[in-house]
């Protein structure tokens, strides 16, 4: 039996448009981002996907993308689970900074390492910073020590995997079709795990906003195939645009 999983990065956010490091900052979708959510829903509808359950983060850009896609799918009723474990990677002291200006200051290669390397985190955010997640009530029930002040992709994967094993994988094994709407780096972490991508190869992986990535898995959740829905060239161009965000102007 083939199990189907769709990974969907949220639509364009205001800080995507502004080319700023976002991380755990809770920013809105742009009008284009809202349109991308609807377009993602249409692509999934055209594919004939009938979901049983959906998962998303606790950040509104992912939540609103999921809502827009489900409305287009006419599957608004779908059970939705939200978890902080699907949040974007925490960008530490880089959050809020302009990516191009940061590249001009520190060099494009350093910014690429911070953005795309596997195990090197950006400079940490101080726990006394008002933006640290320990001051956000949505995380009030969590162990303060579990809340990051910065993350690498490696530590993001460590955060995401328990949710995969405890929540998503059992549903897939039960034969359910699952939609996960999350963020560039939490989805890169899942992609790395599912496809057994090396630490070096993951550096070059960029996930575009608003384009569903369909995985077909076997009974043991091993990947049989995966592809972006819609025009492959459009997905390629969108991924290249993501890669270019960390370059100096």
Swiss-Prot record:
Protein name per its UniProtKB record: 2,3-bisphosphoglycerate-dependent phosphoglycerate mutase
PROSITE patterns (alphabetical): PG_MUTASE (PS00175)
Keywords for this protein: Gluconeogenesis, Glycolysis, Isomerase
Protein family (similarity comment): Belongs to the phosphoglycerate mutase family. BPG-dependent PGAM subfamily.
The protein's Enzyme Commission number: 5.4.2.11
Function description: Catalyzes the interconversion of 2-phosphoglycerate and 3-phosphoglycerate.
Origin: domain of life: Bacteria
The organism of origin for this protein: Xanthomonas oryzae pv. oryzae (strain PXO99A)
Gene Ontology biological process: gluconeogenesis; glycolytic process
Catalysed reactions, as listed in the record: (2R)-2-phosphoglycerate = (2R)-3-phosphoglycerate
UniProt xrefs under Gene3D superfamilies: Phosphoglycerate mutase-like (3.40.50.1240)
């Amino acid at each position: 039996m083939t199990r189907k999983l769709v990974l969907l990065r949220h639509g364009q956010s205001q800080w995507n448009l502004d080319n700023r490091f976002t991380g755990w900052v809770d920013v809105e979708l742009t009008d284009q981002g809202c349109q991308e959510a609807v377009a993602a829903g249409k692509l999934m509808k055209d594919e004939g996907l009938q979901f049983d359950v959906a998962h998303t983060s606790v950040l509104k850009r992912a939540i609103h993308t999921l809502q827009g896609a489900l409305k287009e799918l006419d599957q608004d009723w779908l059970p939705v689970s939200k978890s902080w474990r699907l949040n974007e990677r925490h960008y530490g002291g880089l959050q809020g900074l302009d990516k191009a200006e940061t590249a001009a200051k520190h060099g494009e290669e350093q910014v690429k390492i911070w953005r795309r390397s596997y195990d090197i985190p950006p400079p940490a955010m101080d726990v006394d910073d008002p933006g640290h997640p320990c001051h956000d009530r949505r995380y009030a029930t969590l162990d303060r020590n579990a809340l990051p002040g910065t993350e690498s992709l490696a530590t993001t994967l460590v955060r995401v995997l328990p949710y995969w094993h405890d929540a998503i994988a059992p549903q897939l094994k039960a034969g359910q079709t699952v939609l996960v709407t999350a963020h560039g780096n939490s989805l890169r972490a899942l992609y790395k795990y599912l496809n057994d991508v090396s630490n070096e190869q993951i550096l070059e992986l960029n996930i575009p906003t608003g384009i569903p990535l369909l995985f077909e898995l076997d009974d043991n959740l091993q990947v049989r195939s995966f592809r972006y829905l819609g025009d492959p060239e459009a997905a390629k161009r969108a991924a290249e645009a993501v890669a270019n965000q960390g370059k100096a102007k």
